[in-house]
Amino acid sequence: MRRAAVQLVRLRAVSQAQAAVAFGVAPVMVWRWDQALAAGGVAGLVPARRGPKGASKLTPQLAARIAELDAAGKTLREIAAATGVSTFSVRNALGRVASAGQHAAAGAAAESAGLAAGDDDAGQGAVVPVLPDPVPRDGERALARWGLLGEGAVPVFTPGARYPLAGLLLALPALEGTGLLGAAREVYGQVKDGFYGLTATLLTLVFLALAGEPRAEGATRVPPAALGRVLGLDRAPEVKTIRRKLGELAAAGQAADLIMALARRHAAARPDALGFLYVDGHARVCYGTRIVQKTHVARLKFPAPATMETWVTGQDGDPVFMVVAEPSDSLAGELRRLLPGLRGIVGEGRRVTVCFDRGGWSPALFADITGAGFDLLTWRKGPAPDLPAEVFTTVTCAGDRGRAHQYELADTIAELGISEGPRKGQTVTLRQVTRRVPARAGATRQIHALTSRTDLPAGEVCWRLSSRWREENYFRYARTWFALDALDSYAASPDDPDRMVPSPARKAAAARIRQAEAAAQAAEAARDAALLQLRSPAPGQAAYLSNQVINALAAPVEAAWRELDEADQAAAAVPARVPPGALSPDMARLDAEVKQITHAIRMAACNAETALARALDGHYARAGDEAYALIREALIISGDIRPGPGELLIRLDPLTAPRRTQALAALCDQLTAAGARYPGTDLVLRYEVKSHPTPA
């Protein structure tokens, strides 16, 4: 190319400027080529080798010496002076130079030494390329297209450095503890043949959730090649593929079985965390044009179209399982429906305590709970007589995290009458623990807790019931990070025509009755005041009461009572409950199958993240405040992935601060000791963290 440019200029076929434009160089470069050809012939046009002209000084022995000095706490300048190389070469040897500049010939030896530092014990001392191309999977994709591959491609990892999202692999040991993959295999068995099998699909959704993109649409914001590398594939599935796979699972109609299988595994892995189960309803607000039944949304403080769900969490606030509640059903009704499922999760004969708020208030339900072999803990609803001040004592209780709580408590017994169901007329006797708290203007008020547990100290009764807010904390956290309220499917079906819902006309009729009652009372008060004035005239003034006067005063009262009678009759004619079609012919129920599947996946992801955060306890000074933030940072950090004989080494890059890197290193030691395997392979997972850069 250079010789051709010079010859064209010498033949005056083109000018020097035209040749420069044609060959994409500056005019001065064409002139230099002319001078080089004249001075050295064709050999003078051959570009010289860039970079160092000799062999690299960073031999394996020198790189090992640099690593020893770095481990001894020497600075970069001290190491450079001791080894006779530059500080830049020291950084190269320690792997602290950005990978973009490490492909040059002069830095090849430095990159090899830097990436291999500390890995000799694993036999990984060879050069590892930065972001290599994945293993081609075109043949497997072609087989999958014709249905000949079977269920999913096998994960294959390419040794490489600086893989984005390598930190997501930290979640695999904790995810194994949740039992998600095993539960899904138990429920669904083998899914439809394709390149992405059941395990790859579930791992994709879990990794997306942990990367901050829990919805299927989040796959558009995560590079598919980057996510594919941690899946052991050439690329991750796209949004349409994820939706299709979710649709295939939903078509089986076994989402509830998946959640129950996941709950049984949770109970088997953490039986001590299920001594107290917190149950509460959650309103998932629905936005859009579909007509969905309205329900009261506590966080919005007004009714809105919503789907009701009932959630059960352990005593630590970790989600155990959930069910889609029946529309218009109360928490008391849902609790009664959940009792057989709870027994199947905790096992026969085990007596756990079910905790819930006043929404589950029902003496008949209390009898059902204790009759089913459970204990209960709840707040008392409705007015109750205050206890005298002398029965209260100050009690100190230590929580499960060592924090002391002080209460003013009174311990008594309460008998509640049952006014409904087959136990109507019976009574249920419960222990009542009353707490006295400050109120406005220096006053006090009393809050009553009811329980069937007689063995618990009064302070623990109060603390356990207050800990119900851990479930609310999960709702808030999952709404922010795990798309708790997201609409994962646009499918809907007509509402059940045989279902009965409260009639809005009943409310209007009751309001008319209240207005008529108020009008009748006002008319009677006006009549009585007029009669009193006529019967008590001023001194010296005569008063005459005739039938005409009395009838005139009584006429408004009689009219008001007639209005009240008419309102009562009209209200009696209005049915208390009507079919949904009577309110709106287009009333619909949103699809719950896909949502339950995504709930199960995100519950497992959240529990895995929580397990990692708890593992930092004792290794990170601010774990109580920053554990989750550190885990979220670690999950999206880059790192090296090195498959070896029977193992998969994940060597992560350091975090933003040395103290956080040290905490991550302690976490990696725990995860390595767990001996988990990458799903679908026999590769044992090993974790390491690169040392944090030391300023020169």
Please annotate each region the language model reported.
Residues 28-31, 88, 240:
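Key DNA-contact positions within bacterial/archaeal DNA-binding proteins
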Residues 1-14, 59-74, 202-210:
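Short, amphipathic alpha-helical "recognition" segments used to contact nucleic acids or chromatin
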Residues 1, 114-302, 310-329, 336-345, ...:
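Dynamic "connector" segments at or just before major functional cores
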Residues 5, 66, 204-205, 219, ...:
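Short, conserved catalytic/metal-binding motifs centered on acidic residues
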Residues 1-2, 47-62, 190-197:
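Short, Lys/Arg-enriched anionic-surface-contact patches
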